[in-house]
């Protein structure tokens, strides 16, 4: 089970992805702007940060920087619509048109396991 923060602006997509993750046993917090990201990071720790495809590129960069600054050790997954990802600093990129619910869930689980292994090793 991973602690996941999903940042985006498309409510339907956020709700769908939250449902997929919660059914698999993950804890999920949704954030729609930087203020909510900072608040969530102060309230708890996250293994995986998901950045939605509907965010403009500059906003994705700000969100990524904020997650890295306020959620130490977080792994970032970027969803994108384009052929080339917007966010070079993400750990993983998923193209929306090529992603199934199962591949999304597998990717989050793999990222969380990397984060958890690193966290345990440093303790």
Where are the model-predicted features located?
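Short acidic active-site motifs
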Residues: 33-37, 59, 100
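Conserved N-terminal glycine/acidic-rich loop preference
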Residues: 34-35, 46, 54, 85-95
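Acidic, metal-coordinating helix/loop segments flanking the phosphotransfer/catalytic sites
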Residues: 30-48
């Amino acid at each position: 089970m991973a602690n996941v923060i999903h940042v985006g602006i498309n409510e339907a997509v956020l709700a769908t992805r939250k449902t997929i993750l919660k059914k698999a046993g993950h804890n999920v917090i949704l954030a729609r702007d930087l203020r909510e990201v900072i608040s969530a990071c102060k309230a708890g720790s996250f293994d995986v940060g998901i950045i939605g495809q509907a965010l403009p590129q500059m906003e994705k960069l700000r969100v990524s920087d904020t997650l890295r600054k306020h959620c130490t050790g977080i792994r970032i997954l970027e969803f994108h619509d384009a052929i080339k990802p917007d966010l070079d600093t993400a750990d993983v990129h998923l193209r929306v048109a090529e992603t199934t619910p199962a591949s999304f869930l597998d990717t989050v689980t793999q990222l969380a396991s990397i984060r958890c292994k690193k966290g345990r090793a440093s303790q």
